[in-house]
């Protein structure tokens, strides 16, 4: 298994910083990507990839899952249908980690922003969209940050929301931006302290975005709500300070779920296997008979058709990347792929 190194919450890749802002091309780049037929294939071991539900494909898409940063390969997207994984793209923009991605339900496109390409030496400020057939690089002026960003789709505004990250000089940024398919717009530079490895999900029932935890100046348990273009901090006693965890919103039961993560800045020695649920303003620790192992940075998403929370991968206390798939059915965790 591939091993990784984290100091604090920053990844140690190389001495090179982020690149300067990506030059704006005169014409968009268009890359055909759709495989002729779905290819049944398990994703590689990876951590902190995005797991996003695509309503047209009726799949949970695993985005920014990179196994070997020494290889220069195009970005691959895998889809989970509840029984098996399939590779749904072949070809596309360069693979990357720690970028932001979101699915725009109104326009039916997957959005990809920033991240570190797999040479790990530079980050970029590219904006790409995938319409299910082709990737198109958008000709736009980008946000300030270039990686360690998080994105969600805000159905109320019809725009995708991006928060935090590192700028090209590797300064932490606490700006909030929106993407409408044509341009990026800065909405705020106040609110939560800049951070990395936090939870960021959309709550459609209350038309708001939820931010929990992460590593700011230290591991935090802050809870923030983005609604009506403004941040508000709220407090619900619960999991405590946490970073590198998985978080997903169950739209069927209107509940927020958190799994795994690190409870201190000593990331690998402080991993947990706890499952928490927040419903109606109250946190509760669940006690299932079976559970995924202790891990950091698992991918976590919700399938609204099958009404299942899905967890994929992450890393363990020995710094090994993981490749198992688990589902939460509302009562228990069940391992469905690469079980040990």
Q: What name fits each language-model region?
A:
Residues 15-17:
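C-terminal motif of bacterial Sec signal peptides marking the signal peptidase cleavage site
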Residues 1-6:
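Bacterial N-terminal signal peptides that target proteins for export
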Residues 19-21:
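Bacterial signal peptide processing site
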Residues 29-340:
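Kelch-like beta-propeller repeat domains
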């Amino acid at each position: 298994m591939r091993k990784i190194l984290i100091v604090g919450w920053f990844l140690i890749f190389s001495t090179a910083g982020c690149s300067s802002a990506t030059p704006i091309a005169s014409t968009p780049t268009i890359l055909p990507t759709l495989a002729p037929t779905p290819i049944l294939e398990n994703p590689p071991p990876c951590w902190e990839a995005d797991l996003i539900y695509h309503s047209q494909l009726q799949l949970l898409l695993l985005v920014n899952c990179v196994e070997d940063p020494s290889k220069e390969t195009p970005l691959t997207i895998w889809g989970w249908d509840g029984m098996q994984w399939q590779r749904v793209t072949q070809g596309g923009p360069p693979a990357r980690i720690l970028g932001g991605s979101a699915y725009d339900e109104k326009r039916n496109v997957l959005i990809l922003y920033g991240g570190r390409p797999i040479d790990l030496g530079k980050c970029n400020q590219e904006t790409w969209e995938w319409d299910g057939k082709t990737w198109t690089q958008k000709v736009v002026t980008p946000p300030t940050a270039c990686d360690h960003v998080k994105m969600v789709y805000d159905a109320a505004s019809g725009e995708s929301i991006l928060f935090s990250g590192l700028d090209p000089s590797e300064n932490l940024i606490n700006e909030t931006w929106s993407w409408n398919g044509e341009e990026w717009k800065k909405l705020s530079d106040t609110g939560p302290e800049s951070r990395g490895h936090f939870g960021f999900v959309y709550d459609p029932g209350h038309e708001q975005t939820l931010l929990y935890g992460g590593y700011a100046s230290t591991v935090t348990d802050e809870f923030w709500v983005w609604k009506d273009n403004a941040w508000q901090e709220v407090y619900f006693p619960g999991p405590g300070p946490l970073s590198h965890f998985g978080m997903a919103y169950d739209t069927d039961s209107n509940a927020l779920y958190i799994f795994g993560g690190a409870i201190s800045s000593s990331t690998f020695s402080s991993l947990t296997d706890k499952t928490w649920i927040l419903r109606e303003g109250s946190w509760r620790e669940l006690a299932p008979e079976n559970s995924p192992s202790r891990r950091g940075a698992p991918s976590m998403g919700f399938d609204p058709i099958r009404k299942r929370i899905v967890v994929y991968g992450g890393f363990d206390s020995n710094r090994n990347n993981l490749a198992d798939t688990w589902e939460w059915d509302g009562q228990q965790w069940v391992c469905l792929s690469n079980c040990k």
